[in-house]
Amino acid sequence: MAPGLPTAMDRPHFIGIGGAGMSGIAKILAQRGAEVAGSDAKESATADALRALGATVHIGHAAEHLAADASCVVVSSAIREDNPELVRAAELGIPVVHRSDALAALMNGLRPIAVAGTHGKTTTTSMLAVSLSELDLGPSYAIGGDLDAPGSNALHGEGEIFVAEADESDRSFHKYAPEVAIVLNVELDHHANYASMDEIYESFETFAGKIVPGGTLVIAADHEGARELTRRLAGRVRTVTYGESEDADVRILSVVPQGLKSEVTVVLDGAELTFAVSVPGRHYAHNAVAALAAGAALGVPAAELAPALAAYTGVKRRLQLKGEAAGVQVVDSYAHHPTEMTADLEAMRAAVGDARILVLFQPHLFSRTQELGKEMGQALALADASVVLDIYPAREDPIPGVTSELIVEAARAAGADVTPVHDKDASPALVAGMAKAGDLVLTMGAGDVTDLGPRILDELSK
């Protein structure tokens, strides 16, 4: 096992091993020599990848899947207390470890960069992982999405840097002690866990307080929530700001769209740097600059890291081109919060100009729809036409009166052309029928709407 890794994690069992965060930790543990086992609801490419690393992956949740000699059981906040494997762990006296504690253990003895914020964590973490790898620095990383290249959400590297997403949704990011922390933005999103912006600020203040002595907080200068956090933290932590604001420490001078790419010019430590970002959208350019500033804070020369950022070609579901058929491009977006929806739609508009943008949107979570349904509808008004599916519940039970109709009504009030569809399986044919050559179709949401992109392409090919 790697230095600093508790022996209690030499035979871990993961409940929900196929999840983005869980699978990454499982992969790193397997690469470090642990005897990894776990269970997931269904077969997947992730399950196959884990098996290829020597892990045992069971399909379905059952008490007998948990080996009596497991050293610990790893869970995320999404695992219910009545899960049969969790119940069995209690009966056997096997320690239960939260995903965040396992990740914190993996980072012990290394130089962690923890990437936090309401939006953009996966992209920024990925940009750092790819660019640092491009420079042969051998980083370890744990990402909440799958890279286009090198094709994994996690890796045990031989270098001293560990890049990880830091999730605020359940306050698990309080477990980490980073040398560099990034805060991309601060908004109220996870309404089941936070009642107010004050609670959000307090949570991010706690996170920033975990930065090791001599460490650095890299934080957005253009986002009001981040600026307020900076004001609250004044004098308590070394801070480097980035953005287009004149007072930013790392100032963005320009973001020039170039089709599905951007050219970004910044000033860092008095030197002007111009580099390419291989994904479209101003928000992704800002993510790249955050990565650049974080690398510089760790001592990686910006003049070397900036060109290496061009090696980042995207994360699955983050404006990922799924294909083209009948002259129609189909792109997948993970956006599920109004801010993300707006940013991705604006990025696509900048990329395609006057071409029509059609959106197939699947709301994610009843609680989020209850609080932000109006804003989601307003965001959809940026598209030329939208189809809205029923809410993807994920871990939540229904809330009376909360349906996707809240979004549809708000979209229509904002002047949007929107069609509600309750039969998800019928939506690919409907969207394909709406599209014509030159259009761009965007499947949008954090649920299983991603599976519909290939089906739309199939319909277009008929």
Swiss-Prot record:
Keywords: ATP-binding, Cell cycle, Cell division, Cell shape, Cell wall biogenesis/degradation, Cytoplasm, Ligase, Nucleotide-binding, Peptidoglycan synthesis. It comes from the Bacteria. One of its GO terms (cellular component) is cytoplasm. The keyword Ligase applies. ATP binds at G117, T118, H119, G120, K121, T122, T123. InterPro entries: Mur-like_cat_sf, Mur_ligase_C, Mur_ligase_C_dom_sf, Mur_ligase_cen, Mur_ligase_N, MurCDEF_pg_biosynth, UDP-N-AcMur_Ala_ligase_MurC. GO terms for biological process: cell division; cell wall organization; peptidoglycan biosynthetic process; regulation of cell shape. Disulfide bonds: none annotated. HAMAP family: MurC (MF_00046). This is UDP-N-acetylmuramate--L-alanine ligase. It comes from Streptomyces coelicolor (strain ATCC BAA-471 / A3(2) / M145). The gene is murC.
